[in-house]
Swiss-Prot record:
A cellular component annotation (GO) from this entry: ribosome
Name recorded for this polypeptide: Large ribosomal subunit protein bL20
Disulphide bond pairs: none
Top-level taxonomy: Bacteria, Pseudomonadati, Pseudomonadota, Gammaproteobacteria, Alteromonadales
Gene name tied to this protein: rplT
Keyword line: Ribonucleoprotein, Ribosomal protein, RNA-binding, rRNA-binding
Keyword Ribonucleoprotein: yes
Pfam families linked to this entry: Ribosomal_L20
Biological process per Gene Ontology, one example term: ribosomal large subunit assembly
Organism domain of life: Bacteria
Length: 119
């Protein structure tokens, strides 16, 4: 079995890692050993934050719906309960969008929820 020298493959691997670390601060973008650590950690953060992003957006939507429904005299939980009783199925993303950009429509939704709660 012939001897294998690693020059070409090592260089390619180093280039790949340094390309991924482009734009990082200081030695993280220039030194291979530090760049490997930085790229690995960045990958871990990216993996974790792709999951957290979903949670954070849901929190934001709920906060917006809560603020808008309270302006119309109903708490968030009672508003959602009223919508369920009125059999109005709009998800929180769309509700938050309506609350921000179309206050008249949101006010009518709150009224429908109030009617369903009093029945």
């Amino acid at each position: 079995m012939p001897r294998v020298k690693r020059g070409v493959t090592a260089r390619a691997r180093h280039k790949k890692v340094l390309k991924l670390a482009k734009g990082y601060y200081g030695a993280r973008s220039r030194t291979y050993r530090v760049a490997v650590q930085a790229v690995t950690k960045a990958g871990q953060y990216a993996y974790r934050d792709r999951r957290q992003k979903k949670r954070q957006f849901r929190q934001l939507w709920i906060a917006r719906i809560n603020a808008a429904s309270r302006q119309n005299g109903l708490s968030y939980s009672r508003f959602i309960n009223g919508l369920k009783k009125a059999s109005i199925e709009i998800d929180r993303k769309i509700l938050a969008d309506i609350a921000v950009f179309d206050k008249v429509v949101f006010a009518t939704l709150v009224e429908k929820a109030k009617e369903a709660l009093t029945k």
